Amino acid sequence: MKAKHWYDYLWVYAIIYFALGFFNILFAWLGMIDFLLPLLLAIFGGNKFFCNHLCGRGQLFSKLGTDLKCSRCKPTPRWMSSKWFRYAFLLFFLTMFGNMVFQTYLVAAGATSLREAIKLFWTFRVPWGWTYAAGTVTDWVAQFSFGFYSLMLTSLLLGLIVMVLYKPRTWCAFCPMGTMTQGICKLKNKE
């Protein structure tokens, strides 16, 4: 049995992150750790250390799928790990992220008002009106929180769906952060 490290328990962080956002949307900013740290580690380390050791979401999928037997453990369809699908999904994800940043900019510039809504799959509004008390922070900070939490929650649900249908960490095959870090590592290792 391999020795346990502190980072073997980061699946708890994933649960805490989503629970905190459920009660106060401003905790969505903590998700920037999962957004920036993999990129920084890939840029400066030239490896996928984050994906392999620090990704709480991947660990959560392993815990649920393998340990709690919530996965059918069927092989991941080849198209999900194909280069064209991974890059198309990354492009889609970055487009959604860019749209979220643009909406935040519009709120900051006063061109539009704050949209206090969490959306699943960029379409369906989740009725969590209690997650934010208006006026607590500037509107653009809250707008970013709603958008980013929506993005994170949607990706969690996509990961859970493919975890149940296929192998526990099927999400990792086309995770946008994994695709970006892999690209960075390939560039770094060519140097």
Please tell me what each predicted stretch does.
Residues 1-191:
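Non-ligating segments of multi-cofactor redox enzymes
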